[in-house]
């Protein structure tokens, strides 16, 4: 997980604030599986077509690459201009 001031201080951190905790932070094995399943379904559904901030944030949350928080609303809006694969190249 990168620091808040790192590479992911844009769109992803802002959107992830409202998402559930990553699976490794959840103590219950059943809830952990539910979270992983949910993120897997969302990932498969939006992998090729996601252009919105929250869908891409979900992708990075699933991979544990996203920042924990972000105050840059303009960065989130600007990042909506990039495609899913552009975002992967841009932030990896």
UniProtKB/Swiss-Prot annotation:
Cor may interact with phi-80 receptor on inner- or outer-membrane of E.coli cells and inhibits the absorption of superinfecting phi-80. It is found in: Host membrane. It comes from Enterobacteria phage phi80. This is Adsorption-inhibiting cor protein. It comes from the Viruses. One of its GO terms (cellular component) is membrane. Keywords: Host membrane, Membrane.
